[in-house]
């Protein structure tokens, strides 16, 4: 950077007007001019002629000379100076501030020989706002309108290349943007119609009233429950008599219960002779499941039929009989009777209370 050479009438060397002004603003050594009009004086100063000459002399490929000439010449003697309006503060900065704004906003990315000063963002934005203050709106629409407008607008920061305008969108730093940005709702992207969510299909739980659980797995109900036991006992004699008289079923086993039979274990020891003669043969020690219909209740009982070795002999046991004994209220001294249908091989079991004869003293 040099001083102005003599040209077009000569003149002394002066530093660049706009560069000196920018440096003074950056260093805060010169106060800002008064924005109000200055009082007019009686004598009108001569109108200066501002000649800005930018000469780029490329003498060769390696050497480049940049001469910037700026001088204030005296009024030409051939014409009479015309009166100029009173300075209006920032209006006289038209030549300087245009360069100032272009340097501050860095609107052009093309290489140039101009010297770029490192200006503070606050000065750059202040000058930009004073020059373009008419571009900012004085009122803002409702928040929901701003949201729709901003959501559908293309963001300048997404576009490639330099900023195309000096609006608020060209400032990416929050400190350089005006306070109006705080009143705008956040931009969450374009508004799209929400997809209808498919209703969740929950697994259907099906409960059957016919399936009833008992405390033991050895009981199967047909359609009635044990609560019908008192009513069913009314036809006990008639049904038993009918079955016996029909000849389809015959008694194959009769056992008087002992204290060990009605214990908590629920295990009934069967007579060896009757068990081997009428019940299915046991070839292994593994239990055999026997299904027996109740004589009184519409229930099918599942018993485990097994044997225990006993001194080169066998002891036959009807296991899992605790629920059957409890349902009929059988105690020691009562009797169980097992019936068998010879043709299909079905079994029927019956519990009978013992009859105690009471003797009275004379």
Curated annotation (Swiss-Prot):
PANTHER family: B3 DOMAIN-CONTAINING PROTEIN OS04G0676650-RELATED, B3 DOMAIN-CONTAINING TRANSCRIPTION FACTOR ABI3. Keywords: DNA-binding, Nucleus, Transcription, Transcription regulation, Ubl conjugation. Residues 253-355 bind DNA. GO terms for biological process: regulation of DNA-templated transcription. GO terms for cellular component: nucleus. InterPro entries: B3_DNA-bd, DNA-bd_pseudobarrel_sf, LEC2-like. Polyubiquitinated. Ubiquitination leads to its subsequent degradation via the proteasome pathway. It comes from Oryza sativa subsp. japonica (Rice). It is found in: Nucleus. Residues 30-91 are annotated as: Disordered. This is B3 domain-containing protein IDEF1. Expressed in roots. Induction: Up-regulated during the early stage of iron deficiency (at protein level). One of its GO terms (molecular function) is DNA-binding transcription factor activity. The keyword Ubl conjugation applies. Transmembrane segments: none annotated.
